[in-house]
From Swiss-Prot, chains A, B, C, D:
Family affiliation: Belongs to the glyceraldehyde-3-phosphate dehydrogenase family.
GO CC annotations, alphabetized: cytoplasm
PROSITE patterns xrefs: GAPDH
Molecular function terms from GO: 4-hydroxy-tetrahydrodipicolinate reductase; glyceraldehyde-3-phosphate dehydrogenase (NAD+) (phosphorylating) activity; glyceraldehyde-3-phosphate dehydrogenase (NADP+) (phosphorylating) activity; NAD binding; NADP binding
Subcellular location: Cytoplasm
Pfam families assigned: DapB_N, Gp_dh_C
Protein's organism: Thermococcus onnurineus (strain NA1)
GO terms classed as biological process: glycolytic process; lysine biosynthetic process via diaminopimelate
Pathway: Carbohydrate degradation; glycolysis; pyruvate from D-glyceraldehyde 3-phosphate: step 1/5
Active-site feature positions: 141
Binding site for D-glyceraldehyde 3-phosphate: 140-142, 192-193
Keywords noted in UniProt: Cytoplasm, Glycolysis, NAD, NADP, Oxidoreductase
Catalytic activity: D-glyceraldehyde 3-phosphate + phosphate + NADP(+) = (2R)-3-phospho-glyceroyl phosphate + NADPH + H(+); D-glyceraldehyde 3-phosphate + phosphate + NAD(+) = (2R)-3-phospho-glyceroyl phosphate + NADH + H(+)
Protein name: Glyceraldehyde-3-phosphate dehydrogenase
Length: 334, 334, 334, 334
């Protein structure tokens, strides 16, 4: 028996999760919702994915364009075991009542508050916490990135200070700026530290900045250690951490541009770089402080988490079995 | 018997042509050259592609990195029937003597002068001119884009004025600016008009501007017609023109960003958009003037031309057979 | 007697016009309006300019911040002879009824429709048309730029095709993108041609593109001539045209960045470049076609027009006297 | 008697220092050097500043352009008491021998190694160290920014970790990228920490990133305190620190764009923001850690330091007298 999955919202995250679902042997994609018949909707149809209107209010748009939908969100909810809410931040909380009423489990994304779900989730950090749950929140791309590497060195952490340099808009988003400025979150520490703490109990503070780029976030991480650790140990640890990859500037990885080029060279779908990219040369320890720099592909790093969350919620596999299946199906390198 | 192909230069164009060669049933990729052992070189090796040093002077770099090469360019030249020169603009002309001495045919890219080769080439416009030739130049990405659409309406053209708004650097190139300025080619008309004339004999003048974007060029084209033509005729013509696609703003194609997203949604390798993208709504005729706007994916539009040029040079197929084979092998939509 | 001037909207255009008014010996700045007490409002106060709330609904914002205003827009209207409406595009039309009721003359900006005012205005092209009028529209930055140079060669024009490459946002605007894309106006010809025709009766068609830069627009202009003209004649004409300056790439003016640097080197307030910048080397004539490239500083080129419009509306000076006074007071080079 | 000052290199820094010299009542600008007759050279001439060729090898360029120079660098050196070396990074060290031979004192910029000069200099931190010296290095824009604020809280500092988000190119520089990427300095800690230590003896580590913007650098600073300090104390301290200004997001200072707009609104020459801009809301203390965010106008923050350095080298004024004179002459707010 395959778990029947619906996706509410077929944008940057939704379409990637939909694709990932189709790559699993224990899941079936039932349908996706759209608010308008744009090229992404046509592409879904071309792929044979049933497209539902995200609400009755959107039906006229589809009718006017002659785009036949399979129904509305409520129709979709009747057919699925779980809905992945990939709507814009804050809407998931509003949708929750609808999912509850329909009696379907739901996964929310990091744009929702932690309180929207029973557990906040990063597979390699707390898979077990989501076992059997009805409502799970996959944390944001940045938080996922922090947790992937920090959970790997968690036992050494006394305190973390992370500075996040964030892309201002996704490649497909032409509405948002800035075009030529740096915009700080002036409230320091920023909200990302507490968000990490919804998954792993570490002492962490962060600050965040928006810069005019579209392709990846970058994190400058400093860890105050509570027991000795050398740079080569950290390299070993990260080499053995799933969904974390080391990249060398010496091989030409000078910026986020070459990391994306790496994903393109692999012919990854949408140049997804599901793995967190750590610059190997940046890993250093001075006294009791560990430093490293990592980059996060905001469009895709949470995709495997959504798949693993489904398995945990239906208790379909244990942690490492799920991670292994997800990794293998998506071509995640390790 | 398959034609044995080498690629001199495994960068933006070279790696795409190499990939395209591996997709042909009548060609065999013998090897590629690199000047340094960067991640692209490692990727080639992973793919089982023999990597040669682009010259003896580069051997120490590979040796120091412990990267084993299959030889140097001269070794590669001994094994191939044709070399695709994908070196930086201007270097091809210098390399020509080496190719001549080795007795191999050669394809040059648009960064070289027309006089470097016997013929300048765009498959759908002048395939036959390259039949049996030893030296063929595939024209630049911009010139290819102009010729694809203009050759389709060639009989109607009295005069063309095209304004090219060019991306300043490729996605993988972080060296070049500008970051926040528009840079005109102050010599008007620019060199692109005469370059078009190396392939089709039309009356054309152009101007060109560099702007801070990495993903696509855009052309604003105005054609003075010598006989009547309506917008709907042009739509028909372009719908029946190979390697040209119509995109509608109404479906969400508001900018070059969504065109690239379309290629990503198709899971095209490196988000290649081999086809020239014409905005359907932009096609209009007022009096004796036709207007339209098109976008060019500078990283990939010349790739199919390189493949077709090989077939023409070895007289392996006639024009439409070659175009059909190339299109099918690369997933080109029409 | 000085004309009493109020400014409704103290943003990019409003603050520059306010400054310009203070530089005139025949005008008096009575006050400006703001919707919120931001740093621009504080700066106005520092300069001794009375600040009014743009409406009663905005008063609480000022009160909460402890920022004392001099009243609201209606109070300001009681004290002025003319109001310069520098509100966001489209709001001017709505404000007109208020101005009419208050019995004050009004100047609108290019974001309003031509029908909002009795005349659309560029001083050097049609100053006389505005004499004694109550409602005048200063056309947009792009339209002003086109008219400054085209009116200088008007008698030679058979047809104009202009391509506008537009900055996506002003330097102070961090909300708007795109960050990495080119966005065409897919309706060709664009609305700019008809807008030019509200001032000068020439045959003109245009297309327009938005690109990720903040500092200047650039226009690529092609004129089909109805009588012979040589490039050197055009250079002579432009050298004798007010508010048009020739710049040479040879002297380092390679892009819009160096044009702004020129204004900064002059210590112009806000690096205003009131003059339209034409690249001298770009001026060329081939057959019956004239080509040239110009750049427009969108933040400031319409400022002198607002001043001249005031003089025309109150019949304070004839055309060349007003232009001379305005130029001299603002340091316009010619 | 006024000190006679020459400027070697009339680019971004050189032209600003030249201007600043002309604003001092105890200095006289003798001349500046250029390598080519570009618009900056013409502007210097317009301002009545003698222009010298930066070397004999550059004379033909000036001759060909009909630009009359006042001589070469060696002629200039004969006439001055001190030369401000504002040549590109690394050239100053090479020029030092020439200055020594000519027997003139010299100021170097932060692109040179500390060992090039006798002392590295930030006026408010170590003015006295430069008294009577022959060779002084004004540290880089970023290092100056760090020292201005950190020296004000120096007695509280146990350890500093600063992350620098750097503009990729100056507004006038269209050669350098990246256009759409973030580029880390992968060697962590970066060289900026040791550079701070050439001026003040604090325990500091840094990391650095280049992002696609041209207008300002931003620093995210975390200080581990060795004695208690509250946010309001830090606000008090910074309010009383020269060349440091507090800006509030609440007043509209959301990004670096509005900081530059502030300087433009002041009609500062070249929109210079000589002062370091600290976001008031960002100042916070949590436990023993102080956080704050600041921005640095890379084109101008070192200009007052160059002026103060001259006074120190000739023992023309004591520290606070010099700072006061420099501030007043340049309109520095405090």
């Amino acid at each position: 028996m395959k778990v029947k999955v619906g996706i509410n919202g077929y944008g940057t995250i939704g379409k990637r999760v939909a694709y990932a679902v189709t790559r699993q042997d224990d899941m079936k994609l039932i349908g996706v919702t759209k608010t308008k018949p744009d090229f992404e909707a046509y592409r879904a149809k071309e792929l044979g994915i049933p497209v539902y209107a995200a609400g009755e209010e959107f039906l006229p748009r589809f009718e006017n364009a002659g785009f036949e939908v399979a129904g509305t969100l409520s129709d979709l909810l009747e057919k699925v075991d779980v809905i992945v809410d990939a709507t814009p931040g804050g809407m998931g909380a509003k949708n929750k009542a609808v999912y509850e009423k329909a009696g379907v489990k739901a996964i929310f994304q990091g744009g929702e508050k932690a309180s929207t779900a029973e557990v906040s989730f990063v597979a390699q950090a707390n898979y077990e916490k989501a076992l059997g749950k009805d409502y799970v929140r996959v944390v944001s791309c940045n938080t996922t990135g922090l947790i992937r590497t920090l959970s790997a060195v968690q036992e050494y952490i006394d305190y973390v200070y992370a500075v996040m340099i964030r892309r201002a808009a996704d490649p497909n988003d032409i509405k948002h700026g800035p075009i030529n400025a740096i915009k700080p979150s002036v409230t320091v520490p920023s909200h990302h530290g507490p968000d990490v703490q919804t998954v792993i109990p570490i002492n962490i503070e962060t600050s965040a900045f928006v810069v005019p780029t579209t392709i990846m976030h970058v994190h400058s991480i400093m860890v105050e250690l509570k027991k000795p650790l050398e740079a080569k140990d950290v390299i070993d640890i990260f080499e053995n951490t799933t969904r974390v990859l080391l990249f060398e500037k010496e091989k030409g990885f000078e910026s986020t541009a070459q990391l994306i080029e790496f994903a393109r060279d692999l012919h990854r779908e949408w140049n997804n770089l599901y793995e967190i990219a750590v610059w190997k040369e940046s890993i250093s320890v001075r006294g009791n402080r560990l430093f490293y720099i990592q980059a996060v592909h905001q469009e895709s790093d949470v995709v495997p988490e959504n798949i693993d969350a489904i398995r945990a919620m239906f208790e379909m596999a244990d942690k490492w079995e799920s991670i292994r299946k997800t990794n293998q199906s998506l071509g995640i390198l390790k």
